[in-house]
Amino acid sequence: MDNSSTLIDENTPLVQNKQERQESFRDLKGHVKALLAAFYMAMIAGLNDGTLGSIIPRVKQYYDITNETISLLFLCSATGFFISAGFNGFIVHHIGQLKAIYLGGTVQLAAYFVLMMGFPFPVMASAMVCSGMGMALMDAAMNVFTANLPLATLMLNILHALYGVGAMISPLVATYLLEHDISWKGMYIFLAVCSIINLITVTVGFMGVKLDEEHDEDNTDNQQSRKALTKAAILHPMTIIGALYILIYVGDEVVVGGWGYTYLTEGRHGDPIAMGRVISAYWAGLASGRILLGYLAGKFGEKLMITVFTMMIIGCLTVMCISADVVLNSSVIISIGLLLGPMFPTTISLASKVLPRSYHTTAIGFISALGAGGAALFPFITGMISGKFGILSMPYACIIMTLGMLVLWAMIPSDKPFFGYFQKNK
């Protein structure tokens, strides 16, 4: 076996799947309702992550605060993500995956009700902790469920493309509110309505679906207690490296999509309405990249293509550092969205192949929940940096994050040689 796959042995699904028949869309029959519910959860996640960045200027004005202070909202959200990441396996094993989804959705909805009221800033910050906790539980669940379906790689690409669609919609709604002089609180009213629909789709979609069926089988097969299984899953190298990679990746993604609006309007003096549409186009690029570039990554090899895309992102960020032209910066930001697209679903797909199936709920849930915390942690750090050095420091911070991604990606195991496509077609 190739040296890049040293963490994979003959007993992992990665090797076993090579001998199985080709999967088809017929294999998804019976999963359609649940899959649609998971897709909608992904859109909710995107709506959530795309919201705060698009309303930062108005929230700053409402509370009369600085970039450093408002960045605390990202930190509070990250705290909620990390709490859920630490307890996700425990919660799922004790109340089941479906109840964990309901718990996450209910906590998320409660947070939106608080946020729409415009309470004092400390209350808003506390609500962001709850929002992060709820979102992390749902994020982990939708990734675990989808990663174990037939055609998992394609379904994950669609799942995360819909995340991008959700994140694209948020700036459009925020821009509409700005154009019609409606308070930023309207964004959270909109999110609360979407969250109510989410609880309905979960109820209908997962009705009769045995999400926890595999746990009993896996525990019997592996002769391990749940505690030992959870520990082994989290300490697996794929889990640790994958979680760190996704942590930085999601941070990079949301820093550009979140602080990008402030960067373009305050740093490059772009028109607020037009720049809101640019950020929507960034998220649309992300959604498109997850399908189009995800296909290229699968065809030519994930390790090679993701490395190429990452290096191209570094080039784009360098252009942002040296050019003050708002049109060029806008174009580059949209391009970054396209290039970032396939990275999350590709990592989750590789994890589902490398890890034993008994690890999937805990390991993929941990990768997703901890990694999604990057959507709050790194925007917080970037906000602190921009408060000290100015918003034009944002692309420099993103370059550092992207270099970290490049190093971690080189450490992630793969089922193909680095130049697998070219070796195969010699």
Name each model-derived stretch.
Residues 52-53, 235-288:
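Extracytoplasmic gate region of multi-pass secondary transporters
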Residues 83-122:
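Conserved MFS/SLC helix-loop-helix module at the cytosolic interface between two early adjacent transmembrane helices
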Residues 84-97, 289-302, 386:
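Helix-to-loop junctions at the C-terminal end of transmembrane segments
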Residues 136-150, 342-356:
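Intracellular juxtamembrane helix-capping segments at the cytosolic ends
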Residues 152, 158-213:
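Helix-loop-helix hairpin linking two adjacent transmembrane segments in secondary transporters
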Residues 300-347:
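C-terminal transmembrane helical hairpin of 12-TM major facilitator-type secondary transporters
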